[in-house]
Curated annotation (Swiss-Prot):
<dbReference type="InterPro" id="IPR043135">
    <property type="entry name" value="Fur_C"/>
</dbReference>
<feature type="binding site">
    <location>
        <position position="91"/>
    </location>
    <ligand>
        <name>Fe cation</name>
    </ligand>
</feature>
<feature type="binding site">
    <location>
        <position position="103"/>
    </location>
    <ligand>
        <name>Zn(2+)</name>
    </ligand>
</feature>
<dbReference type="GO" id="GO:0003700">
    <property type="term" value="F:DNA-binding transcription factor activity"/>
</dbReference>
<comment type="subunit">
    <text>Homodimer.</text>
</comment>
<keyword id="KW-0963">Cytoplasm</keyword>
<dbReference type="GO" id="GO:1900705">
    <property type="term" value="P:negative regulation of siderophore biosynthetic process"/>
</dbReference>
<keyword id="KW-0862">Zinc</keyword>
<dbReference type="GO" id="GO:0008270">
    <property type="term" value="F:zinc ion binding"/>
</dbReference>
<dbReference type="Pfam" id="PF01475">
    <property type="entry name" value="FUR"/>
</dbReference>
<feature type="binding site">
    <location>
        <position position="127"/>
    </location>
    <ligand>
        <name>Fe cation</name>
    </ligand>
</feature>
<dbReference type="GO" id="GO:0045892">
    <property type="term" value="P:negative regulation of DNA-templated transcription"/>
</dbReference>
<feature type="binding site">
    <location>
        <position position="98"/>
    </location>
    <ligand>
        <name>Zn(2+)</name>
    </ligand>
</feature>
<comment type="similarity">
    <text>Belongs to the Fur family.</text>
</comment>
<feature type="binding site">
    <location>
        <position position="95"/>
    </location>
    <ligand>
        <name>Zn(2+)</name>
    </ligand>
</feature>
<keyword id="KW-0238">DNA-binding</keyword>
<keyword id="KW-0479">Metal-binding</keyword>
Length: 144
């Protein structure tokens, strides 16, 4: 996404345009397929020669989550990771050995969840599905 789009996205979300917010949003655009922790954001920015304090990073990540720019997940590692909210629903499979995260969408799983909710008198408004296993790379390395 271009800087102009990022500025518009921040303004549309009701957030003031600041240097740290632009840098962090740009970083998530560059790493759109990854799930990044606050520590990852800090490290990547430092590698790029950008110095933003860890407290500021946490604050911006929270603001972005509240504004619907980022989604927060808590995988097995215990620390929060964030990804751009692309507007599409997907679920996650997480490797318990190396932490690799694979995103997927399965219409059959979605339909089954809706059916279970309906059978129990619910209407699903949101959900998150995390599956944990051992990825093929770790299986090949014998990390069962």
């Amino acid at each position: 996404m271009e800087k102009f789009s990022n500025i518009a996205q921040l303004k549309d979300s009701g957030l003031k345009v600041t240097g740290p917010r632009l840098k962090i949003l740009d970083l998530f655009e560059k790493h759109a397929e990854e799930h990044l922790s606050a520590e990852d954001v800090y490290r990547i920015l430092l590698e790029e020669g950008v110095e933003i304090g860890v407290a500021t990073i946490y604050r911006v990540l929270t603001q972005f989550e509240q504004a619907g720019i980022l989604q927060r997940h808590h995988f097995e590692t215990g620390k929060a990771v964030y990804e751009l909210d692309k507007g599409d629903h997907h679920d996650h499979i997480v490797c318990v050995k190396c932490g690799e995260v694979t995103e997927f969408h399965n219409p059959e799983i979605e339909a089954l969840q809706d059916k279970i909710a309906e059978e129990n008198g619910y209407r699903i408004v949101d959900h998150a599905l995390y599956m944990y296993g051992v990825c093929s790379d770790c299986q090949a390395k014998g990390k069962r």
